[in-house]
Amino acid sequence: SEMCIRDRLYFEMMSCLTTTGATVFTGLDKLPVSLNGWRCFLSWIGGMGLIVLSVAILPLLGVGGSQIIKAETTGPLKEHRLTPRIADTAKALYIIYLGVSVACAISYHLAGMEWEDAIMHMMTTVSLSGIGTHDASFAYFNSPAVDAVAIVFMLISGFNFSLHFMVWRRRNFLIYLQDAEAKAWIATAALMSACLLYTSPSPRDRQKS
């Protein structure tokens, strides 16, 4: 029914904007590029949507952007401003976000993706939404290089982007090891990777099966 279609579209839109990653669409390979691209773009916007909301909308309602940022964020941005003005902070974070995005898209292309897929998967990788454009997801490409790019940039995007800004400004990578959130993220990623490697069958076992 028409209402059912509206519900599905609303669910898909909110899933992308909140980077939830859930989808109600099937037959992703048959969807037009424009629709898949829009899904990925919404995810990419959602990846840094809090800053847009704080800087562009809330001040018009009489709510300071700095108030919601302090209430809703974690990491260095919660304790002190990265720049004197919130608008400048938003600009700095978006420059870093855009830089990571461009590097991710180029890396995907060098790993074997067409530019079309590289750009769309870049948007869902750096936003950590996981929205796919193929029913088989990354298995569609059957490429260890593509998988490696996804892993690296998901690890990078898992860090607080305000922390990336501080590392870039101070030129000191040890800042990552001084932040509790970053250390927890590194430890969790390392632990999960070790568990997956331990439980995954070896190439010899796969050949036997």
Language-model-derived ranges and their functions:
Residues S1-E2, R6-R206:
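Membrane-proximal intracellular helices of multi-pass ion channels
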